């Protein structure tokens, strides 16, 4: 239940009437933004402590000064409170909470929700939306190797739905016994589901159970004189047993565990997580954060909640977790909540010895090294920001920079890229591209005008305009952006600057133009602010090129056949229905192409020559 939802907030009355139940509280500022999320066993005691006369660190004092309203949610148990707290922190990213940015999105194997499901892989936490997930895997290569192994053992389809729906005959995968061809009805729903169920057990790590089940099915099929079916099971067993023999390490040895090391220096902290399976380091992940006013225990508490109570899907959980030394009593409840979520007991090792101590020291060495790199990079970036601020004569700190670049192929497939840098560095998740429409071929000025106009329009609506907008180009390009700024009346809200290569077109010799200022500026090529301008510009250029190449590739594939005389919409559709896609068509022989209804041998030869 939300206790307060009004604009007029009486803090004194609120504190006096607080419940003593467990739950989650949210601190909001005068703008209605959540600035802190916390969890408490006793909401009344915890929230009142912020306003008591006891000693508090500077960060807490600063936060309390900004509190305009407090909201609470009562939860039935500590476990639910931890989950809600973690979800709210990830959703709102309050500025006074300890925040972790995952180093990268890990790949998952996904079994889709189709009638005849496919197995594939996706990156990131959104994978669960595609179907049932297994993972995460350490790298793309490891997940691809697993997919390849699966295809040798379990004949479950891996093709895209568009390809699957267009089939009128079995593909090569069926011929080499790596797919049951549900696309053309060569397998019953029951048979397919049976293979799928065994595959799921295999991916869940139930190796012995899979061997027993397939063996039993093989003998049963043999007794029922279904010899072809028995042979399929026998072939599966052969591959599985070879795979089993390759596992040199005894899986019964308890060697699956996580090691979490923390290193703190000044106002920063770094967490290194080593994931150990069967005695080998299979993953090294790390997080570096601003930890001003925090101690090691509070950082560990926040990390454990973020990593183990988050929404990352995993099928294998560590039996042991080794931690840097923290106050055990302060995280006991959280440990219990993690075990409750997993559904199994975890052995928490906070005072490791012998080999466990060696693992912890290794994690802490990794954390220290990562923090040194992080602080060095952050310091250099802050110097560049300050230098740019000085050059632009800005009165306020630069919190957000956006840069636009245009890319096209011979005047066509025009793309505008927009990359984002914050005071923490590049924000890849906020990068975007604009498909430019309804302009003359190769008109970069019109493209810049359209892209900037669309961004400013949406930025005013969402109230998220940047502090600085960079345009890749010279006077002509910046004049287009100036026109947009005048149209929307934001000349005083966003600082505009462009970077042109000039006559020499040499990196480091670019000409700089400020918005609404006809002066041509130059800076020393080693000037920190100039280096930042070029860094952001280069990032925008790369982002634009990648998007434009994708667009050209898509356009080319669909236009290759259109160039052949005699191949109209009906024949193109027939070709796609028969082969399922451009890739399969490009691999087909002349004789195979000629089998398509309406395609003569001569026309098949012309189509084949288009791809070779």
Swiss-Prot record:
Sequence ranges assigned to domain GIY-YIG in this UniProt record: 20-98
Domain of life: Bacteria
Residue ranges of every copy of the UVR domain listed in the record: 208-243
GO biological process, one term: SOS response
MF terms in GO: DNA binding; excinuclease ABC activity
Keyword Ribonucleoprotein (UniProt): no
Gene3D superfamilies linked to this entry: 5' to 3' exonuclease, C-terminal subdomain (1.10.150.20), GIY-YIG endonuclease (3.40.1440.10), UVR domain (4.10.860.10), UvrC, RNAse H endonuclease domain (3.30.420.340)
PROSITE patterns, A to Z: GIY_YIG (PS50164), UVR (PS50151), UVRC (PS50165)
Record keywords, A-Z: Cytoplasm, DNA damage, DNA excision, DNA repair, Excision nuclease, SOS response
Subcellular location: Cytoplasm
One GO cellular component term noted in the UniProt record for this chain: excinuclease repair complex
One Pfam family hit: HHH_5
Function recorded in the entry: The UvrABC repair system catalyzes the recognition and processing of DNA lesions. UvrC both incises the 5' and 3' sides of the lesion. The N-terminal half is responsible for the 3' incision and the C-terminal half is responsible for the 5' incision.
Subunit structure and binding partners: Interacts with UvrB in an incision complex.
Family, similarity comment: Belongs to the UvrC family.
Stored HAMAP family: UvrC
NCBIfam families in the record: uvrC
Protein name, entry field: UvrABC system protein C
Organism: Francisella tularensis subsp. holarctica (strain FTNF002-00 / FTA)
């Amino acid at each position: 239940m939300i206790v307060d939802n009004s604009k007029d907030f009486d803090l004194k009355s609120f504190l006096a009437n607080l419940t003593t139940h467990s739950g989650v509280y949210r601190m909001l500022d005068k703008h209605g933004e959540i600035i802190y999320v916390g969890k408490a066993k006793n909401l009344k005691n915890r929230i009142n402590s912020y306003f008591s006369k006891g000693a508090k660190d500077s960060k807490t004092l600063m936060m309390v000064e900004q509190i305009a309203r407090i909201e609470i949610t009562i939860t039935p148990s500590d476990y639910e409170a931890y989950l809600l707290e973690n979800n709210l922190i990830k959703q709102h990213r309050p500025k006074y909470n300890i925040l972790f940015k995952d180093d990268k999105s890990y790949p998952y194997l996904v079994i889709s929700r189709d009638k005849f499901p496919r197995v594939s892989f996706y990156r990131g936490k959104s994978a669960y939306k595609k179907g049932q997930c297994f993972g995460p895997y350490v790298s793309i290569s490891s997940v691809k190797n697993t997919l390849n192994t699966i295809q040798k053992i379990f004949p479950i389809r891996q093709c895209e739905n568009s390809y699957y729906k267009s089939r009128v005959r079995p593909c090569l995968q069926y011929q080499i016994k790596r797919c049951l061809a549900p696309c053309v009805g060569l397998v019953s729903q029951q048979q397919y589901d049976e293979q799928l169920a065994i595959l799921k057990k295999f991916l869940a790590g139930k190796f012995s159970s899979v061997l027993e089940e397939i063996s039993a099915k093989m003998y049963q099929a043999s007794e029922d004189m279904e010899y072809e079916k028995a042979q399929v099971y026998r072939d599966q067993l052969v591959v599985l047993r070879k795979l089993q023999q390759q596992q040199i390490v005894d899986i019964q040895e308890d060697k699956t565990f996580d090691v979490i090391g923390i290193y703190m220096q000044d106002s920063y902290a770094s967490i290194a997580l080593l994931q150990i399976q069967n005695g080998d380091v299979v993953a090294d992940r790390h997080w570096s954060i601003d930890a001003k006013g925090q101690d090691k225990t509070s950082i560990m508490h926040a990390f454990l909640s973020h990593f183990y109570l988050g929404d990352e899907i995993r099928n294998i959980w560590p039996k042991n977790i080794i931690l840097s030394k923290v106050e055990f009593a302060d995280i006991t409840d959280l440990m219990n909540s993690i075990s409750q979520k997993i559904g199994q007991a975890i052995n928490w090792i906070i005072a490791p010895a012998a080999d466990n101590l060696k693992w912890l020291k290794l994690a802490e060495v990794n954390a220290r090294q990562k923090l040194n790199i992080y602080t060095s990079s952050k310091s250099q970036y802050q110097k560049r920001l300050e230098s740019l601020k000085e050059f632009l004569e800005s009165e306020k700190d630069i919190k957000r920079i956006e840069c636009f670049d245009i890319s096209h192929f011979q005047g066509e497939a025009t793309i505008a890229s927009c990359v984002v840098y914050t005071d923490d560095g590049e924000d890849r998740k906020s990068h975007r591209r604009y498909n430019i429409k309804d302009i003359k071929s190769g008109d970069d000025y019109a493209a810049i005008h359209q892209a900037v106009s669309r961004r400013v329009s949406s930025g005013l609506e969402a109230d998220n305009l940047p502090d600085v907008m960079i345009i890749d180009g010279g006077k002509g390009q910046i004049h287009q952006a100036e026109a947009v700024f005048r149209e929307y009346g934001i000349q005083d809200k966003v600082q505009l600057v462009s970077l042109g290569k000039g006559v020499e077109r040499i990196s480091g010799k670019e000409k700089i133009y400020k918005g609404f200022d006809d002066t041509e500026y130059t800076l020393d090529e080693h000037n920190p602010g100039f280096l930042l301008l070029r860094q952001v510009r280069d990032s925008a250029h790369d982002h634009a090129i990648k998007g434009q190449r994708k667009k050209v590739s898509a356009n080319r594939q669909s236009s290759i056949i259109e160039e052949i005389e005699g191949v109209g919409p009906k024949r193109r559709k027939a070709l796609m229905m028969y082969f399922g896609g451009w890739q399969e068509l490009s691999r087909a022989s002349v004789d195979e192409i000629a089998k398509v209804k309406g395609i003569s041998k001569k026309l098949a030869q012309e189509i084949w020559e288009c791809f070779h």
